Amino acid sequence: MRPGEAESSGAVIAELMREALSNAGILDAVPAMLYGGFAGVGREEERRDLETELYRLEVADEIIVDSDAAIALADAFDGGAGIIVIAGTGSIAYGRGIDGSLARCGGWGTVFGDEGSGAWIGRRALGIVAAAADGRESATALTGAILTAAEVNTVEDLVPWAIAAETTEVAALAPVVIATAAAGDARANALLSLAAEELVVHVRALALRLFGDERASIPVAFSGGLLQKGSLLRKKLEQRTRSAVPGAQIKSVEIIPARGAVRSALRRIRLPSAP
């Protein structure tokens, strides 16, 4: 959710709720609780605005709006201590300490933050292509790959494309960078290594803030489209995490944020824990 868009976001969520209930054959009941994790509500004002709008729309008796990072953390550690790093279109790290305290790192948005994310990688890939065209950098296979992905013919054509592109379109260049790196391009590999370095800085910052020492035993999990198990960026990030955060205990299980929301909701209404 973008700032100031609580009303439109609430309408979309309400419609999705109606569709879900209808598909389940539930036509007249009001859910006891809506526990949702959404992008763009990591700060209190956005969270409160969306929650207020959903109450106005009467989508459930009790409504809890949380961040997408929070429900991913809940699935990764089921209420226990740990740090999760999420990298998709944007990026953020979120964690819970042994004492239950919560902290976030990053997630400042794609304009001046979200380091290591798809949008961040895409923007830098465009810069590399421009630099190679100028002769400021060596030739790279990224040039042809990016031109093909953007469906333009020349580097000059990338200027109007980039100006008009949505953030998700720029982020969609990240898989192109990953594929080019996997094919052996040195510049693409260097960009992915830098992305991994940016992400591991988030882990280390939270390790120090929540656990006091990066050498402490710290459960760490990864989630998001760019950090699927086996991906080149994840491999680089795992390697750097083990080096920079010696106490990191990396979880290899798949993170399902929606399951984290269910677990959190069940704890609130005191029902048996979700599987």
Predicted regions mapped to residue ranges:
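FAD-binding subdomain of flavoenzyme oxidoreductases
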Residues: 35
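ATP-binding/phosphotransfer module of carbohydrate and carboxylate kinases, centering on a glycine-rich
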Residues: 1-32, 55-56, 75-81, 126-275
